Regions:
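Charge-dense, helix-prone N-terminal extensions
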Residues: 2-215
Length: 215
């Protein structure tokens, strides 16, 4: 048993090493760009939205005294051209980096970004590329299936009922972190069918009953 466990451990460490190398390569391969204004970013997207795989946007911290586009402005322009925000990274004492990338096929919409996109359409700012992403999402159901952001996410009522039937799982659920709580909510909200949602609920109840989490 020890031998097998040792082999598993080596394999796991090897895979983790590969992931770190890939992340490092990803970091180095994506260009860093700075834009002073929202118009500068919009002009860049007009020329590059269909041929760029994404960028790291350098954004100045509020108290830095530097002038750059801010995150909210960047997100608005990104949505207009069918792009979306991804993760962020610290860079220096005065700046941080926000990743913006083209929206992947079939990627889910958050309710916040759906509302922002709707407002951009109504104000006449939405560009053809962004409108095409909205139309695709409406056609395949992703628009109506938009999920809550972490700040607004509520535990689905049917999952609360399942928790009430399992005191042990419920007690552990009440102790888990906000990240783990949202991970469960997000997976339930984004289930494409009722059968998938029910299966996920059963899986999560069993997981919580054993004192385990997704992260």
């Amino acid at each position: 048993m020890e031998g097998r466990g040792s082999v598993r451990g080596k394999v796991a460490r090897r895979e983790e090493g590969k992931k770190k190398k890939k992340a490092a390569a990803d970091w180095e391969s994506v260009p860093i760009r700075a834009f002073k204004t929202q118009k500068d970013f919009a002009d860049w997207l007009e020329k590059n939205h269909s041929k760029s795989a994404g960028i790291w946007m350098r954004i100045a911290k509020k108290d830095s005294g530097k002038k750059t586009i801010n995150y909210a402005e960047g997100l608005e322009s990104a949505l207009c051209y069918g792009w979306i925000d991804a993760h962020k990274r610290p860079e220096s004492e005065s700046t941080w980096l926000q990743r913006f990338v083209p929206r992947r096929p079939k990627s889910g919409w958050s309710k916040i970004n759906r509302d922002k996109a709707t407002a951009l359409v109504e104000s006449g700012q939405m560009r053809p590329a962004g409108l095409a992403e909205i139309e695709r999402a409406r056609a395949d159901g992703r628009w109506d299936a938009a999920y809550d952001s972490p700040a607004r996410a509520q535990v689905p009522a049917e999952f609360l009922k399942e928790l009430d039937r399992n005191p042990r799982a419920k007690a552990f659920f009440e102790t888990i972190s906000r990240i783990n709580r949202y991970a469960i909510i997000w997976r339930l909200q984004t289930a494409k069918t009722a059968a998938t949602r029910e299966q996920r609920m059963r899986t999560f109840i069993e997981m919580l009953e054993k004192g385990k989490t997704l992260h």
